[in-house]
Design a protein with these regions (language model features):
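Glycine-rich, charged/polar anion/phosphate-binding loops
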Residues: 277-279, 338-343, 395-397
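Non-catalytic N-terminal regions of enzymes
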Residues: 1-175, 182, 232-237, 244-265, ...
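Helical lid/core segments from catalytic subdomains that handle acyl or acyl-like groups
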Residues: 164-179, 189-190, 224, 284-371
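Flexible, P/S/T/G-rich "lid" or insertion loops adjacent to the active sites of thioester-utilizing
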Residues: 185-243
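A compact, surface-exposed functional segment
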Residues: 255-290
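Short, glycine-/Ser/Thr-/acidic-enriched flexible segments
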Residues: 276-280, 361, 415-417
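Membrane-interacting alpha-helical segments
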Residues: 96, 134-138, 153-169, 199-218, ...
Length: 444
């Protein structure tokens, strides 16, 4: 049974620092639909079991202002929130968007929560919403699997420190010292990134960070559409188009980006593809790198070979040279909050990416968290963002797909000012793009 490494890895440290700077952060949401209801006691056991997985921890600040934070044991499981009224199954997507507005706090807790709603057709929908600082999509799926198998997944993190001792400071200092070589390399990577983006970043960064307040205003319920398709049909269509299961998901994201108007001056869509490097026994919250692919949407609905080749080239380059962005994360503890806020805006204002994550085939246990097999299972990504900021950065689009028990679930979370701001408008685009690919599907 793996033991939780007490200090955060570089990507996890960067995630929590960005969360502190922005006052918000990315979420991972996992939803199940059960046709005949569930046992309330089984749901409560599932909630308690999650506290003994990687989700049962929170972030404790380092004793040093530039040090690595620590994982410590969370005081209690996340709460269970029950919807007061029965939900029309057609509105499950809308319900997931509402759940994204509820607060999670990876530092003070709760870092996650469960939500449940009865359906008017007699079924039940259950949601697990987790701060991305606590875990990525595969970490959350792994936590569910651990509870179902009854093995707890991992040894709980150490308890919080009652007080900071001289020994604690020395330990944090040792960890910080070991990180210095990586920080030096990270600084070099940051300089290279800045040079590569010199036509964009310097002018943007010269604008005062105080000229644009971050985090204010009403948070938008970004529309969510959930799609379901048989795994056999998904695989057959991918093969017919000369692609793979993950390339088909990427192709959908490219076409959806075009349908929402998320294209550059050349008509191309920039996709951000998380690439997992999670291994057995991995206790990192976020274990991935990011591949950025720029591709024109024309022709992708009839031939995926070009997109597949572009992704392969990018992966080969990532394996050989690594990611500059990942290397640059090592300097995150030394970046002032105001600069972190502005850097995020610079990227979003000038790139307007489409985030696409294909999680692959889940273990069947992921579909039966309470012992009963769910008919549908979806993972939803995104974050609660004020409308003023969403308009400024040109909206958002996240596509997440994966399969379990013979069914592929695809979630689309998107908002585009002046084009797509309601669930109905997003559903229209999703239906149209699925039809362009010749993909049948059921939608919520």
């Amino acid at each position: 049974m793996p033991v939780v490494e007490p200090h955060l890895a570089a990507l996890d440290q960067a995630s929590v620092l960005l969360w502190r700077a922005l006052g918000r952060g990315q979420l991972v949401q996992l939803f199940w639909r059960f046709p005949d209801g569930i046992d309330p006691e089984a749901l409560e056991r599932f909630r308690g079991g999650l506290a003994h997985t990687l989700l049962g921890r929170r972030v404790e600040r380092s004793s040093l202002p530039f040090g690595r934070d620590r994982w410590v044991r969370a005081a209690e499981p996340g709460p269970l929130l029950v919807a007061p009224d029965a939900l029309d199954p057609a509105l499950i997507g809308t319900w997931t968007a509402t759940a994204a507005r509820l607060p999670v706090d990876p530092e003070d807790g709760p870092g996650w929560f469960l939500s449940v709603a009865s359906l008017t057709d007699g079924g039940v929908v259950v949601g697990l919403t987790v701060s991305h600082v606590i875990g990525d999509g595969l970490a959350v799926a792994g936590a569910v699997r651990a509870v179902v198998l009854g093995n707890g997944g991992t040894t709980p993190a150490p308890p919080p420190r009652v007080r900071v001792t001289a020994g604690d400071r020395l330990d944090d200092l040792r960890v910080a010292a070991r990180a210095v070589p990586g920080a030096v390399r990270g600084l070099a990577a940051t300089v290279r990134l800045a040079r590569e983006e010199r036509d964009v970043v310097p002018g943007s960064l010269r604008r005062s960070v105080r000229s644009r307040p971050v985090g204010g205003g009403a948070v938008v319920d970004v529309p969510v559409v959930l799609a379901r398709i048989a795994d056999t049909e998904w695989r057959a269509r991918a093969e017919a188009l000369g692609g793979s299961t993950n390339t088909l998901c990427a192709g959908l994201a490219v076409r959806l980006g075009a349908a929402l108007g998320r294209v550059d001056a050349d008509g191309c869509v920039t996709s951000s593809l998380p690439i997992s490097d999670r291994v057995a026994g991995d206790t990192r919250a976020n274990a991935n790198d990011t591949l950025v692919v720029r591709f024109h949407p024309d022709g992708v609905t009839s031939d995926l070979r070009g997109l597949r080749a572009e992704i392969r080239r990018g992966l080969a380059d990532l394996r050989e040279h690594g990611s500059l962005a990942t290397a640059a994360l090592a300097v995150a503890p030394f970046v002032p909050r105001a600069v972190a806020r502005r850097l995020e805006e610079v990227v979003l204002e000038n790139v307007a990416p489409v985030v696409c994550s294909w999680l692959g085939e889940h273990d069947p246990t992921v579909a039966r968290p309470m012992g009963v097999v769910a008919t549908d299972c979806w993972v939803v990504g995104g974050e609660p963002v004020p409308e003023e900021q969403l308009r400024r950065v040109g909206g958002a689009l996240t596509v997440v797909g994966g399969s379990v028990n013979g069914r592929v679930g695809v979630s689309v979370r998107g908002w585009q000012p002046g084009a797509v701001t309601t669930q109905g408008e997003l559903l229209d685009r999703v239906r149209r793009v699925f039809a362009e690919f010749g993909l049948p599907g059921a939608f919520h």
